[in-house]
Amino acid sequence: MQTCLPFFGVVRVSGDDRADFLHNQLSNDILNLPSGQACYATYNTAKGRVLANMVVLNRGDDLLLVMAQDLVEPILKKLRMYVLRAKVVFEPLADFAVAGELADDAKATTAVEPNLAFAAENQNNVWCINLPHTGRFKVGLSEQLPPYDAAAENAWNLHEICSGYAWISLATKETAVAQMLNQHIIGGVHFRKGCYPGQEIIARAQYRGQVKRGLAVLRGSSLEAAGIAVKVGEEEAGQIINTALTDDGSLNLAVIKFSAAEAALTDADGNALTVEQLFFTVEPKE
């Protein structure tokens, strides 16, 4: 199946200092990303909270950033604050779009080890990016991409949810550190590169085991929305990041407390949410 994915927007980054600048701002090794390859990356606050996660594509003469459409303007506004004398230009590409391509029999594919870069190829000016979960992004002019198909978009979202690939949007920015979103597993964080905003917090969380929340797939009886609270009784226990429809309700990718993994979960309205899958390990009770 193929469909345009209106969730995503595209930014072109050009100028002689583009790789150096992004290397110092993002969580992955952009400086050593080869032409014709792509990677996942996060842009974080100084406190390590994820402002946006993205795919970075090196086209040789420039870089493309694929992120949530509703984050494009706020992220560019923040990045431009730090350009100063660097030779780098950010340009949102309004005539570009992103499509998803997925085999009809594709199975959910969870990350086993970080994939810090993956192949991309130019096919008649449409860049095809082979994502680690077996789906493909197609990035190019809107008229060159497959049309929008709601059922196919939902199938794409289900595949990413069940594979553990979260996407931050305006409703969920600054709610989680990278590890809570599985970025250390899928390859969105390079732990041996230099400093970037939030690097100290993210590294400390990784090596001192300070992360107390992680991704989970939750089944609900109705359609949820990004940013909806997950609760245990009256207490906050997490937040829904992404959602997709099923025949009997929804599947939702949420960040939840480790301690809530075996509890009775609900959304903010009291609707039951059932844990289908955890992307973290719960220590057995003694």
List the predicted regions and their residue ranges:
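A common structural junction motif
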Residues: 29-30, 80-88, 148-156, 232-237, ...
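Acidic, low-complexity central loop/insert segments
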Residues: 2-12, 55-163
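Acidic, proline/glycine-enriched N-terminal capping motif
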Residues: 1-53
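Glycine-rich, small/acidic residue-mixed loop/short-helix segments
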Residues: 181-189, 203-286
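Short amphipathic beta-strand starts and helix->beta connectors
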Residues: 41-53, 83-84, 119-126, 202, ...
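Residue-level signal for inorganic ion chemistry
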Residues: 15, 65, 198, 234
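Anionic-ligand-binding alpha/beta catalytic cores of soluble enzymes and soluble regulatory domains
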Residues: 137-217
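Short amphipathic alpha-helix segments
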Residues: 42-43, 103-121, 221-235
